[in-house]
Amino acid sequence: MGQKVSRTDFEWVYTEEPHASRRKIILEKYPQIKKLFGHDPNFKWVAGAMVLTQILALFVVKDLSWSWLIVAAYCFGGIINHSLMLAVHEISHNLAFGHSRPMHNRILGFICNLPIGLPMSISFKKYHLEHHRYQGDEAIDTDIPTLLEARLFDTTFGKFLWVCLQPFFYIFRPLIINPKPPTRLEIINTVVQLTFNALIVYFLGWKPLAYLLIGSILAMGLHPVAGHFISEHYMFAKGFETYSYYGPLNWITFNVGYHNEHHDFPAVPGSRLPEVKRIAKEFYDTMPQHTSWTRVLYDFIMDPAVGPYARVKRRQRGLAS
């Protein structure tokens, strides 16, 4: 089973999440950052091109053997699908069309969701915005592993399994920590997605649908692009609960690696986050940062000081506070 993790509890703190206060300080010093706020007019074309690429790929993978289909799903389709998940992340902040056109953002979210295979764009928005506002809250922030996860996967091999099973924890954890009734848009999202899936099976067979689903699942687990799930908020350095990564994988993930910058300024689209760092570099260069998402996965699994417990948590303060 391997070495047991050294932590036996989460890192409980009694301070506010750090991003709102740092945002205020940075804007006082660099008010020009406000000019970076707003939607990215090029985003919809990039996201749309990825969706089209996956749809065209379906006509190729339908004739592949199952072994080559899995290789294609891991090495190609899964990367695009993971990037589309991060497109959904951008859309959840209304960064595709701006806050004045919410339904345009939701519809693009439905479209970006199609190759992913599982309806998630509306549900993701519902929980993700709370992750920003209530970062670390024990009863609201569903990005934090449950106590059961932390206790079960507390060895080297256990952490390896946990990384492989990450997509399932991301799907089911919100239903345990902070269940919410489905909204009308979630139902529409589900109907649209299931209809798309059914059309794939009807016209092309089961293999293309399997290619999409397998790619989505594999690229959320033991995969280099999935390293951002762990790199963003797992405590690799005591006292720091958010980390940035500035490496080349940002090019295919809408700069999600600029995670301190994103949490400080969620109204800035991913394409402009490097400019935030350039302007306010003294705030970001001094914080711990990751240089490789693959190394993050390796260190998470092999380092006994890191594991599901390595998260900052706060006692519940309630949605009304």
UniProtKB/Swiss-Prot annotation:
GO molecular function, one term: sphingolipid delta-4 desaturase activity
KW Nuclease (keyword) present: no
Domain of life according to the entry: Eukaryota
Disruption phenotype: Primary spermatocytes become mature in size but degenerate without initiating meiotic chromosome condensation in their nuclei. The mutation does not affect female fertility but leads to semi-lethality both in males and females during embryonic stages. Homozygous mutant spermatids show a misshapen Nebenkern, which varies in size and is associated with multiple nuclei.
InterPro entries attached to this UniProt entry: DES1/DES2, FA_desaturase_dom, Sphingolipid_d4-desaturase_N
Keyword match Cytoplasm: no
Documented EC number(s): 1.14.19.17
Pfam families in alphabetical order: FA_desaturase (PF00487), Lipid_DES (PF08557)
GO cellular component: endoplasmic reticulum; endoplasmic reticulum membrane; late endosome; mitochondrion
Species annotation: Drosophila melanogaster
Family statement: Belongs to the fatty acid desaturase type 1 family. DEGS subfamily.
Name of this protein: Sphingolipid delta(4)-desaturase DES1
Compartment(s): Endoplasmic reticulum membrane; Membrane; Mitochondrion
Signal sequence bounds: none
GO process annotations (BP): ceramide biosynthetic process; negative regulation of lipophagy
PANTHER family reported for this sequence: SPHINGOLIPID DELTA 4 DESATURASE/C-4 HYDROXYLASE PROTEIN DES2, SPHINGOLIPID DELTA(4)-DESATURASE DES1
Transmembrane segments annotated in the record for this chain: 41-61, 68-88, 107-127, 157-177, 187-206, 208-230
Pathway: Sphingolipid metabolism
Keywords tagged on the record: Endoplasmic reticulum, Lipid metabolism, Membrane, Mitochondrion, Oxidoreductase, Transmembrane, Transmembrane helix
Membrane topology term: Multi-pass membrane protein
Tissue-wise expression: Testes.
